[in-house]
Amino acid sequence: MQHNKYRPRDHTSIGRAGEFMAAYKLQMISGLEIAHINGTCDLHVTLPSKRVLRVEVKSSIVPTLSGSFKFSRGGSDADIFVFCCIPLSLIRIFSDCQLKGHQTTTLRPAEFTQQAEDDDIEGLFLL
């Protein structure tokens, strides 16, 4: 298999790209305070209420055979999960409760829209 020199080649690079994309969107676009964490989660997000959320970022660059993007939450018990669809440069945000304990989430490309991203980010301000 030949690799494109501009495409990340390993899961760590893909994950790191997603973390930076999520941090950019949450900090620069919405003004939330972000800290990168290397440990039990990927980011800490400080809400205007001063509540700190533990954030796990999951990234995908290649759709499945059905055309959807698949995200695995691993063993994380973060407060929220940010799913980054790198090819579309869009994110979706879900709380632990919304995922209902499922370890894998599959999202169609149509579920990644600018409106959905904006609504998800706005929802953080209600927490």
Show the residue positions of the predicted features.
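Acidic-basic catalytic patches of nuclease active cores, encompassing PD-(D/E)XK
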Residues: 1-35
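Short, basic/low-complexity N-terminal boundary segments at the transition from targeting/disordered tails
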Residues: 14-23, 53, 60-65
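Short secondary-structure capping micro-motifs at structural edges
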Residues: 31, 40-42, 67-71
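Active-site metal-binding core of divalent-cation-utilizing nuclease and nuclease-like domains
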Residues: 32-40, 46-49
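Catalytic cores of nucleic-acid endonucleases
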Residues: 57-99
